Curated annotation (Swiss-Prot):
Keywords: Cytoplasm, DNA damage, DNA excision, DNA repair, Excision nuclease, SOS response. GO terms for molecular function: DNA binding; excinuclease ABC activity. This is UvrABC system protein C. InterPro entries: GIY-YIG_endonuc, GIY-YIG_endonuc_sf, GIY-YIG_UvrC_Cho, Hlx-hairpin-Hlx_DNA-bd_motif, RuvA_2-like, UVR_dom, UVR_dom_sf, UvrABC_protein_C. The UvrABC repair system catalyzes the recognition and processing of DNA lesions. UvrC both incises the 5' and 3' sides of the lesion. The N-terminal half is responsible for the 3' incision and the C-terminal half is responsible for the 5' incision. It is found in: Cytoplasm. One of its GO terms (biological process) is SOS response. It comes from the Bacteria.
Amino acid sequence: MADPSSYRPAPGTIPTQPGVYRFSDAHGQVIYVGKAKNLRNRLNSYFQDISALHPRTQRMVTTAAHVQWTVVQNEVESLQLEYTWIKEFDPRFNVMYRDDKSYPWLCFTWTDEYPRVFVGRGAHHKGWRYYGPFGQAWAIRDTVETLLRVFPMRSCSTGVFNRAKNQGRPCLLGYIGKCSAPCVERITSEAHREIADEFCDFMAGRTTKIVKRLESQMAEASENLEFERAAVIRDSLGALSKTLERNAVVLGDGTDADVISMALDPLEVGVKIFHVRGGRIRGERGWVADRADDADEAELMETFLTQLYGVNASDGQVRDDGHGNAVPPLVLVSAEPTNPDVMSTILSSERGSHVEIRVPRRGDKATLMDTVTRNAQETLAQHKLKRASDLATRTRALEEIQESLGLDRAPLRMESYDISHIQGTNVVGSMVVFEDGMPRKSEYRRFSIKGFEGSDDFAAMHEVLSRRLRRLIEDRDAMAAAQTPDGDVGSLIDPTTGSPRKFAYAPHLIVVDGGAPQVHAAQQVLEEFGLEDEIALCGLAKRLEEVWLPDEEWPVILPRTSEGLYLLQRLRDEAHRFAITFHRSKRSKAMVESVLDGVSGLGETRRKALVSHFGSVRSLRKATVDDIVEVPGFGPKLAGEVVAALSQDKPAEAINTATGEVVDANGPDAGR
């Protein structure tokens, strides 16, 4: 590893203008490319205290041996040059969004004399037209089968086409009306290309013109008493209607747009894009990438747009609108890129006309963005599930944790704890269990903190761990007392409850959320019960994802792509999620009781019915008298008193103790 100071540029030699820089290793291989408004400020940040850098950035600057830069005139040029260098050098420390190459596309071999339509995957060919990608291959194949009745163009392979041509006899599709049989010259090359062009128009969303033309032809055939021809056209219209029904209108104004959303976690980012043409979803696609540093969603979005409409567009990987334009006139995003005007200028240049980039705030575009966001979250969740459920991956993760933390065995049972509250009220704790790298949800536990009042995370964690470890000791003692004279161990079933003694199993590793202070507090509890030599302990700090051990001055830094770190993060995040869920439930119940104390005739049963029906105080506040009357046990008079009580009680501000953010105490995100 190189010392960054060994290749640091001399003071004053770095310009203050905007530009693009690149780090290279000792072999001259470019390993990172970046851009900056002020090159001096940005590059100097890499040569400060290395411990303050992001772990991945630390590895980059210690791997590098040289740094070079190029000054440009403005941010547009810097973004373009950055993209060019990333494409040319493929630097391994840059975030690269790579998608599943198995996505199916609808392909038109436009460079052939008689273009062919087929469903394909993999690399794209220059000059061909592509539509998609699509989520399911069977769905687009079914659509093609239907549309070939309306647009009878060639769909056979080159071998089949040449064989039919040599034999002078078309294949079956030519006989059943699903191909115009250009192989036997039933149709000219120009006429066949017109059919293919109409097929492309339909896939691009320009359906109105085609439907009107067919309706006009059907009416004309009927007037001329050509009923057989009219019936064929009627069937074609039915096929089009069937296809359009499968692909409902999502944007009523017939917009051409790409709708892009991101789902983030500390280690990875999931991206989903819906290609909307003519107001209908014509394709979708998903990506997952490792987060290389602490870049926020705006920076990640800028990187993604650059790669999507730069690298992918040049390779034919972005949906064409039928006119050779990979970039639509409107790009809807879940977060604006860092430099939206600059990005808009670049995309406008790529398209040849103005491209608008914006975040939808209301209407059908905002509704569609919500759908794309849910799909992005699902893309990331499915990726994480696939990664976590693989046996070889889980085994490697446990081995990495064992080696990195210096454990004498793999931590087959791990437990993680978290505390949740708002301003010291409704303090709760959670315990989640992973066995063999997978959640064991039947052994999750929730704790209502009873030993103190107020906001003291350390005292709350002390109580939670003490209660858990006390049960461990008690269950062990009970098992020892039940040991038979012949040496058989006591039953793992509690004779008083008939339930398994689940607390009798000691964890191999306890994971707490936090750094050195949180680990020290948890270690004190282990020492109080004499379990510090039996149960290993670590803390996982947010942001830098450092692993802290008891009595260690420095944290353990696991590689960013480590399966061990990924497993520890999942365990910690699951404890956080479980604690917040319990806190919200408890807080909602307490708020209902507090707000409705003065309403006569409203007992515990009816309060529970309100909470069950509306789900939260926030939803209950929005309810009208008519809404509340629908709840069993509530008449108009009682419902009116509830509405009056809620209108007098205004929600107070609350502080999220994890972030310091002011939140709505009744909101869905309140709680820590």
